[in-house]
A protein has these predicted regions:
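Active-site helix of classical SDR
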Residues: 19, 27
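Residue(s) in the substrate-gating loop at a strand-loop-helix junction
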Residues: 3
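Hydrophobic structural elements of the Rossmann-like NAD(P)H-binding subdomain
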Residues: 41-44, 54, 103, 108
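Catalytic tyrosine of NAD(P)H-dependent dehydrogenase/reductases that use a Tyr as the general acid/base
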Residues: 16, 24
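C-terminal helical subdomain
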Residues: 43, 65-97, 101, 110
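A glycine/serine/threonine-rich, flexible loop-to-helix segment
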Residues: 48-74
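Conserved catalytic-site region of short-chain dehydrogenase/reductase
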Residues: 6-8, 114
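Alpha-helical segment proximal to the catalytic Tyr-Lys
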Residues: 32-36, 99
């Protein structure tokens, strides 16, 4: 699991972004190393998802209510993601239906990376 911050930068998140960017490159390397063995490796890069880890981040940004009111500025879908939405993507990628997907970096970010 990476993060949209592994693909785009935000103020005050340099170290976090660097670590998530490393996950992106590790994913690609593992995919290349193990593709011929049938092992697949993909990374999901969620945007803002309504989880407790983001509540602390929201406090730094002026509070959860303020963040949610302004979320459409950086997430075009206009709302935070829900954990179940990310879980469904994980389940799909782990399924045989995704057997041709490896080395992919998949943004689940409400359109944030399209901006």
């Amino acid at each position: 699991m990476s993060s949209i911050n592994g693909l785009v930068s935000e103020p005050f998140l340099a170290v976090y972004s660097a670590s998530k960017g490393a996950v992106v490159m590790l994913t690609r390397g593992i995919a290349l190393d193990y593709a011929k063995t049938g092992i697949r490796c993909n990374a999901i890069c969620p945007g803002w998802v309504d989880t407790p880890i983001n509540y602390a981040h929201a406090e730094l940004l002026g509070g959860l209510q303020k963040v949610y009111e302004g979320i459409s500025v950086f997430q075009p879908i206009g709302r935070p993601g829900e954990p179940r939405e990310i879980a469904h993507l994980v389940l799909f990628l782990a399924s045989d239906e995704a057997s041709f997907i490896t080395g992919s970096i998949i943004s689940a970010d409400g359109g944030m990376s399209a901006m």
